[in-house]
Amino acid sequence: MLYKSIDEFVKVIDKKKRIIGLDFGEKKIGIALSDKTNLVAIPYSVYIKRSTRKDLGSLYNIFVENNVGSMVIGWPIELSGIESELCQKVVLLANRIIAKYKINIYLHDERYSTAMATRVAKLANIKRKESQSIDDKIAAMLILQQVLDIMKIYQI
């Protein structure tokens, strides 16, 4: 099921499984995973998009290999709060994942996540050229970590 409410999403999380976080872009998908305790988000990879079928298959392999039970996807709304064009693509992807793999997905406001990822890379003294290849997975990590921190409040 697709959730835009964190209140509803936290009720359906399988505590025994990990959570995957995605930063969905036009050409790439940043991927992060929670640790086994669902307390810490860890950058996982940057996936270069190919076709929907191949993308879904690759994501499924990650689900299985890492015991994933739920997903958080960055919701790319504009700074003004208006849904961006990419929002429709995110919903389409989310609905395809749900239909095919029966996984619960939460759409989390991702405003500033890419800017924060760039800042994190800069603070870690990672050169700009290098950081461009990891910004997406850092953004996914930041998005997922925000949700994990909220879950701590709910004591999930």
Curated annotation (Swiss-Prot):
Q: List the disulfide bonds.
A: none
EC class of this enzyme?
Answer: hydrolase
Q: Which Gene3D superfamilies match?
A: YqgF/RNase H-like domain (3.30.420.140)
* Keyword Iron tagged: no
Keywords (A to Z) from UniProt: Cytoplasm, Hydrolase, Nuclease, Ribosome biogenesis
Q: Name one GO cellular component term.
A: cytosol
Q: Which InterPro entries match?
A: RNaseH-like_sf (IPR012337), YqgF (IPR005227), YqgF/RNaseH-like_dom (IPR006641), YqgF/RNaseH-like_dom_sf (IPR037027)
Kindly list the GO molecular function terms attached to this UniProt entry: nuclease activity
Which BP terms in the Gene Ontology apply to this protein? rRNA 5'-end processing
Q: Where in the cell is it found?
A: Cytoplasm
The EC designation for this entry is 3.1.-.-
Family named by the database record: Belongs to the YqgF nuclease family.
Q: What does this protein do?
A: Could be a nuclease involved in processing of the 5'-end of pre-16S rRNA.
Any idea what this protein is called? Putative pre-16S rRNA nuclease
Give the taxonomic lineage as stored in the record. Answer: Bacteria, Pseudomonadati, Pseudomonadota, Alphaproteobacteria, Rickettsiales
